[in-house]
Amino acid sequence: MTKTYHFIGIKGSGMSALALMLHQMGHKVQGSDVDKYYFTQRGLEQAGISILPFDEKNIQPDFEIIAGNAFRPDNNVEIAYADANGISYKRYHEFLGSFMRDFVSLGVAGAHGKTSTTGILSHVLSNITDTSYLIGDGTGRGSANAKYFVFESDEYERHFMPYHPEYSIITNIDFDHPDYFTSLEDVFNAFNDYAKQITKGLFIYGEDEQLRRITSNAPIYYYGFKEEGNDFVAHDLLRSTSGSGFKVSFRGQELGEFQIPSFGRHNIMNATAVIGLLYTAGLDLNLVREHLKTFGGVKRRFTEKIVNETVIIDDFAHHPTEIIATLDAARQKYPSKEIVAIFQPHTFTRTIALLDEFAEALNQADSVYLAQIYGSAREVDKGDVKVEDLAEKIVKRAKVIDVDNVSPLLDHDNAVYVFMGAGDIQTYEYSFERLLSNLTSNVQ
């Protein structure tokens, strides 16, 4: 039966992916959001999905309404109208929990790496068999005939608790979202509760001491680099400027060699988790091996472009662990170039909680530039932290730049520029691209 879905906050990464998925399954889909451009909206526009301004007229009693988790009656006219008129709606995670019951569902959770890992799993499985998927970069695919559903499982505010997947990967546990979680133990408890809802197989990075404490009713398979204590082991790594090669064994049995066109040790682990899950679920490893080779990455995860012979990398990294992984990947691919990091802290609460860790991570770059902190709609700037506080803690001299003047970035020869952040760091990137293009056009 065809339905009409209305998404309140359709540009959200998960929301846009779900909208695309339902659209491809033959449903009528529309949504509302702010006017400001966000990288997910291009896919919606290409699919012909209407993006409307917030307006109570968008809410109709016969629509199936899916609301983004950040919207409430006091900050959104559509939610307020629905509440006042008794029109029901589901939150994103509530809808998803019901939706996945019609499939064999495979979740990917973790503090870091879940979008990339979901992307790898979706790419490989959808090339083997009909698969629906929902990736946190705003990408979604829907098929009513699909047996499998791959999805990203988000821990923020325990949104993954409505999910009961057959299989799940957990990439790591780390302290993040300090506006919600009170401690690392609070984060662990959330993941441990989620783990108990897995029914057939849980795949855990075995070298994470927090993950080693996880318990589940489903069998637990550990993956990692070390042979001791892990079921799936990646070994004989060959990291080059064209990608990464490695072998995988399962409890002493060799499963063969694998290649991915990706960089950084973290991506080898992500791929190993996918190999372990699909092997356990009974998929043909030769097909897994074949399709790993063609994984092209996900949006805003080490996305590269060249402007005026200058390499620019765009990455969503907004936590110290993610910054370290991104810079490691850049050094693998560009070992002879200077690594210039341009980082925008995301949320005041995270910046305060992890200030020292951010400084330590950014010290892995050769040069560092900082953009002003991007505050979340969920918080108020109380003046407790400024980006200059982070700059002072970075051992290598860090400069604060303005989006209207990124010319200091030109002071580097033979450099790779790595723009990182979850806010509007892309506006700085675009300013730099325009500057580079103007330099070319002004040459006589």
From Swiss-Prot:
Its main location: cytoplasm. Pathway: Cell wall biogenesis; peptidoglycan biosynthesis. GO terms for biological process: cell division; cell wall organization; peptidoglycan biosynthetic process; regulation of cell shape. Keywords: ATP-binding, Cell cycle, Cell division, Cell shape, Cell wall biogenesis/degradation, Cytoplasm, Ligase, Nucleotide-binding, Peptidoglycan synthesis. The keyword Nucleotide-binding applies. InterPro entries: Mur-like_cat_sf, Mur_ligase_C, Mur_ligase_C_dom_sf, Mur_ligase_cen, Mur_ligase_N, MurCDEF_pg_biosynth, UDP-N-AcMur_Ala_ligase_MurC. The keyword ATP-binding applies. SUPFAM superfamilies: MurCD N-terminal domain (SSF51984), MurD-like peptide ligases, catalytic domain (SSF53623), MurD-like peptide ligases, peptide-binding domain (SSF53244). It is found in: Cytoplasm. NCBIfam families: murC (TIGR01082). Belongs to the MurCDEF family. This is UDP-N-acetylmuramate--L-alanine ligase. The gene is murC.
